[in-house]
Amino acid sequence: MSMQTAPIKKITLNHLQAKKNQEKIIAITAYDALFAQIFDPLVDVILVGDSLNMSFFNQNDTLSASVEMMLYHTKAVCAGAKTPFIITDMPFGSYKDEKTALKNAIRVYKETQASAIKLEGGKEKAKLVKTLTNEGVIVVGHIGLMPQFVRLDGGYKIKGKNEEQQKKLLEDALSLEEAGVGLLVLEGITTPIAQKITQKIKIPTIGIGSGKDCDGQILVWSDMLGFFDSFKPKFVREYLKGKELIQNAIKQYADDVKKGNFPNELESYH
């Protein structure tokens, strides 16, 4: 009699770490229960990213995202998605020191069903990571192009183009791994150094704009489903013309209403 493996009820950090060098990790962003429920059976990881400040609230950057905003949207995502590993971004200013970071990370765990929190920064965040993990918080690291540093960097700039940057990125990755991060997001990093980091560290890397050699990939859902036509980063592949499809559907609806074709008899009560 053949033994069948029971489906995973909830993806854990152990499941993701076991995929290292074995199977690619599939990750996507989500900000509400509806899309989280749609994505649930198809992905390993859902990130409730502070990118929602741009794609959901139409702001120019992520910096004005608040802890309350992240908690609200994380609750919504957790209500819709039951299986994926759910990561909540710690917004700008929410981990400026250990006391503040611990307070906000504990709120994420107490008030939502998130699996982990994510913070941006390299080896300078190692001590903070240790403090959080010592309290039982799973931390996901994020190095390379860091959106919360966009004003300091003078824009969204690819990292790893010179030897100095490459050395720092590798040092950051190794330091964060030693400090206890469970996963590491590599954003906007040149392919060779992203590959080297992935090979050097034992924890999985999840890339966005960092080449195909990372242990997994993540995209902002509204980018990959074609909801924005004003700007598309080089690394984004559109799998759907979502904006066009929805606008066409709304046009048909409006046309039916104007012509008196909606609702019809079958859609009315008598």
From Swiss-Prot:
This is 3-methyl-2-oxobutanoate hydroxymethyltransferase. Binds 1 Mg(2+) ion per subunit. Catalyzes the reversible reaction in which hydroxymethyl group from 5,10-methylenetetrahydrofolate is transferred onto alpha-ketoisovalerate to form ketopantoate. Coiled coil: none annotated. Pathway: Cofactor biosynthesis; (R)-pantothenate biosynthesis; (R)-pantoate from 3-methyl-2-oxobutanoate: step 1/2. Its cofactor is Mg(2+). Its main location: cytoplasm. It comes from Helicobacter pylori (strain ATCC 700392 / 26695). Mg(2+) binds at D50, D89, E120. Disulfide bonds: none annotated. Belongs to the PanB family. 3-methyl-2-oxobutanoate binds at D50, S51, D89, K118. Its EC number is 2.1.2.11. The active site is at E187. Keywords: Cytoplasm, Magnesium, Metal-binding, Pantothenate biosynthesis, Transferase. GO terms for cellular component: cytoplasm. GO terms for biological process: pantothenate biosynthetic process.
